[in-house]
Each structure stands twice: as C-alpha cells, then as structure tokens.
Amino acid sequence: MSFRARLLAAERLNDSLLCVGLDPEPSKFPAPWTGDATRIFDFCARIVDATKDLVIAFKPQIAYFAAHRAEDQLERLMAYLRRVAPDVPVILDAKRGDIGSTAEQYAREAFERYQADAVTLSPFMGFDSVEPYLRWPGKGAILLCRTSNPGGSDLQNQRLADVDGTPRLYEHLAQLAQGPWNTNGQLGLVVGATFPEELARVRALAPTLPLLIPGVGAQGGDAAATVKAAWRGDKATTSAPIIVNSSRAVLYAGRDAEFASAARQVALATRAALNAAR
C-alpha cells in the first residue's frame, strides 16, 4: 500500500488529522528518567501506546536520537511502531538534502534501515536531491516548502524573476511538486501552520498532495485556521489528507509519572479541535 493510501486509511480508522511528533529530550523526561538518554525508547513507546488510536501518523525526528547516540533506540522504536500500530504510517523527519550516491544512501537509511513510510527532504539542490527517494515504490518524499519558522521568509518568500509569473520560491516549489517532479505520485509538502495564508496558497497550487503541517501547539499555530486553510472536504478537488503535527505540546503535557495520560488528553483535545474545523 502506498504512503498516500496508508494516510487515507489511517485518517478514516482513527478519525484524525493529528500527527504526533516524537522529539525526545531526556532533560524533559519525568523522574526518575530525567536526563537519562537510555530511556528514549521507553519514553517514546509510552507516548505511542497512549496516542496510537488518535493519530493519522507518527513523526520521529532523527536528530533527537542521533544527538544522544540513540540510533539503535530509533530502530527499536520503528520496529515497535510497526508492531503495535501497524495501520499508522511513520514519517522519518530527517530533512535530507544531498544528491547522487549520498542521497541514495540517505534513502536507504530511511526506507531500509528504519523502514519509514515517508521521509522529509530539503529540495534546495533541485530534483536531483529528490529523485533517489522516488525509486522506492510506495514510499513518500515530503519536501520543505513554506516552513513554520520566521526565517523561512528569507528565501521561501522571494520572487523568481526568471520564472513565468514571478512566483515566490515556495509557490514555484509547490507547482513543481504537484506537476513534473511528482513522477510516481509519491510527493508531499511541508507547510507551516504559522502562515495560514501561505498554507491556503499552497493547497490551491497543490490540491492533490499530502501536506505535513507543523506549528500547531508550542509554535502557536491555530488548529481551526490550519484546517480552514488546508482541508478540502470535497473529494472532487482533493484526495490528499493533511497531517497536522504537534510534538512538544503532546510529549511534555505532563512531567510526572502520569505523563502518558497527560499526553493522551492533549492529543484528544487537539484531534477534536481539528475535526471540529473540517
């Protein structure tokens, strides 16, 4: 089953647009795990157990594991996700952006070593940096487009004088991803909830692409505004889901032994807010 099909199935199964980001910071773990990087898997597994029936996807961020020499725990977590939440797709948040044989190895890392359903990529080096991932049938490649950070405007909002219509960079990227780059229907886009007008513009330019939308929760993005900008209930205009990510607001909702229960309550509330805005 393709990444797109798995997303649509998970959306229906769990009645959800919510993605929980797995960004483990040992310094924020509850006692007695506080500061203990050997407990990264245990912490993430508890979050998964508490939220797996509430989400459209999970999104582990590879840097939070690599910084603590915990790639083995990430492998263990990915295997755990496949076992306890087999119907929930997993997006490896890696934001890779190289070309050629290096990109081939990054694709192998994402799809063979970690067996992710999709991976995030930086397309700054052009289609050469995307194409190696499209050789993996059924896997998703989600390209940074209009990101949630304020500094994203430094490049993404600049107009391209040499392109017809002088679109902004993020607009041109959305058009490429919707059109000539999407050779096998595997692409999606990352667009931040913190810029709802740009989010609506990307959805208009890329009506069939899945959108991974960070920025709801700790970054201040509004759930209702996000859904209004990106969701299209009319199947004639789009068959692509939106994947609204929340990481810190869910992971660190509680700082004591009941942290998983607190995470579930925040996930429930966020899912409800997103669904109410459809």
From Swiss-Prot:
> Gene3D superfamilies in the record, alphabetically?
Aldolase class I
Q: List the disulfide bonds.
A: none
- PROSITE patterns, alphabetized: OMPDECASE (PS00156)
What GO molecular function terms would the record report? orotidine-5'-phosphate decarboxylase activity
SUPFAM superfamilies noted in UniProt: Ribulose-phoshate binding barrel
Please give the pathway this protein is involved in: Pyrimidine metabolism; UMP biosynthesis via de novo pathway; UMP from orotate: step 2/2
> Organism source for this protein?
Methylibium petroleiphilum (strain ATCC BAA-1232 / LMG 22953 / PM1)
Where on the tree of life does the source sit, at the highest rank? Answer: Bacteria
Its UniProt entry gives the catalysed reaction(s) as: orotidine 5'-phosphate + H(+) = UMP + CO2
> What class does this enzyme belong to in the EC scheme?
lyase
Q: Which InterPro entries match?
A: Aldolase_TIM (IPR013785), OMPdecase_AS (IPR018089), OMPdecase_type-2 (IPR011995), OMPdeCOase_dom (IPR001754), RibuloseP-bd_barrel (IPR011060)
Q: Record's SMART domains?
A: OMPdecase (SM00934)
- The EC number on file is 4.1.1.23
**Any idea which residues are catalytic in this one?**
95 (proton donor)
Task: Identify the CDD domains for this entry.
Answer: OMP_decarboxylase_like
HAMAP family assigned to the protein according to its UniProt record, in alphabetical order: OMPdecase_type2 (MF_01215)
Q: What is this protein called?
A: Orotidine 5'-phosphate decarboxylase
Q: Which UniProt keywords apply?
A: Decarboxylase, Lyase, Pyrimidine biosynthesis
Instruction: Please give the biological process terms from Gene Ontology that the record holds.
Output: 'de novo' pyrimidine nucleobase biosynthetic process; 'de novo' UMP biosynthetic process
* Pfam families, alphabetized: OMPdecase (PF00215)
Q: Which family does it belong to?
A: Belongs to the OMP decarboxylase family. Type 2 subfamily.
